[in-house]
């Protein structure tokens, strides 16, 4: 019996690509090596139909091509070739106006193009039953595969570091400013506990660019972002009560916007900035704290998660 050949087209090389596309299919092939052969291609040649015709299943996340305008039509071509197309979707197609990429999504009508992909795909996989119910209004062939990890992966096996302090942490991405704002005022309440507690802000990142849109022409220009402009700087202001919970020398070091060569210098301080790490090791940061916070606003985009 010949193996079923599966082509996986991840959306990125970070968290979504790893946990929604790459890891599940590596697991599939390892568990059923006699039944499935999996190839992972981040940049498949869209013009070579002979290449795509080698596969019985094509799995993609959100869009099969970086060019959203071509995605729906290409999925329909694959369908006509008898290839089973599976679209994975982990986020609601239209974030709120608070989301940093909302203006770009609206300008380029990306939400409409994602919906078109949902309708075109033979099957859709998603993360929650709530989201599946929403997707089923446009494609009845929807299946829930909850977000999951491999508990045997080394980064998830780190023992919690011992401490005589109560350590609270937040580990996440750059689109959660209005969720983190729920913690405003926390710093004020922690003033009397800063000697026997710590807060770890994990994922700190000053890389990236600012996209500026000309309101009159719609023209977009990009420039490198300045450290103090990043959302991470805003997160830090909220967590530290505008740096009132750190002494002046520590604040001076923080404002250099660099990782400390000697991490022990401020290791006993209430606030701990933990810089971003690769997707293969970032979860090790959970070993640094005892309580993980996940504040989240109640709106359509977040409810689907």
Per-region residue spans from a language model:
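Conserved catalytic-core segment of nucleotide-activated headgroup transferases in glycan assembly
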Residues: 12-27, 150-156, 161-280
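Donor nucleotide-sugar binding/catalytic pocket of nucleotide-sugar-dependent glycosyltransferases
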Residues: 119-156
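An aromatic- and histidine-rich active-site surface loop
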Residues: 61-80, 171, 180-183
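Nucleotide-sugar-dependent
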Residues: 175, 276-305
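N-terminal pre-catalytic "stem/leader" segment of glycosyltransferase-like enzymes
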Residues: 1-65, 212-214
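Acceptor-binding helix/loop patch of EC 2.4 sugar-transfer enzymes
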Residues: 86-111, 152, 164, 218-221, ...
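Membrane-proximal helix-turn-helix segments that form the acceptor-binding/catalytic region
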Residues: 74-80, 104-123
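An anion/phosphate-binding loop that grips the pyrophosphate of nucleotide cofactors and donors
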Residues: 55, 121, 289
């Amino acid at each position: 019996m010949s193996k079923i050949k599966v082509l996986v087209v991840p959306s990125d090389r970070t968290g979504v690509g790893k946990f929604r596309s790459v890891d599940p299919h590596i697991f599939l092939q390892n568990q059923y090596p006699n039944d499935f052969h999996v190839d992972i291609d981040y940049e498949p040649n869209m013009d070579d139909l002979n290449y795509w015709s080698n596969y019985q299943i094509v799995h993609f996340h959100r869009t099969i091509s970086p060019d959203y305008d071509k995605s729906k039509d290409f999925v329909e071509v694959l369908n006509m070739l008898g290839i089973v197309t599976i679209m994975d979707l982990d986020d609601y197609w239209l974030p709120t106006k608070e989301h940093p990429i909302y203006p770009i999504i609206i300008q380029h009508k990306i939400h409409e193009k994602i919906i078109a992909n949902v309708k075109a795909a033979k099957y859709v996989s998603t993360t929650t039953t709530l989201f599946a119910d929403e997707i089923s209004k446009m494609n009845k062939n929807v299946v829930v595969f909850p977000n999951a990890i491999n508990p045997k992966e080394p980064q998830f096996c780190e023992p919690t570091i011992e401490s005589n302090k109560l350590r609270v942490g937040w580990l996440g991405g750059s689109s959660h400013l209005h969720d983190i704002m729920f913690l405003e005022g926390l710093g004020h309440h922690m003033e009397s506990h800063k000697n026997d507690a710590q807060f770890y802000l994990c994922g700190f990142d000053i890389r990236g660019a600012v996209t500026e849109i000309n309101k009159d022409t719609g023209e977009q220009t990009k420039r490198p972002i300045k450290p103090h402009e990043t959302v991470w700087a805003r997160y830090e202001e909220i967590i530290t009560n505008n740096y009132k919970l750190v002494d002046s020398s520590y604040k001076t070091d923080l404002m250099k916007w660099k990782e400390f060569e000697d991490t022990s210098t401020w290791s006993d301080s209430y606030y701990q900035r933990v810089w971003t790490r690769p997707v293969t090791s970032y979860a090790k940061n959970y070993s640094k704290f005892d309580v993980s916070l996940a504040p989240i606003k109640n709106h359509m985009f977040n409810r689907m998660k």
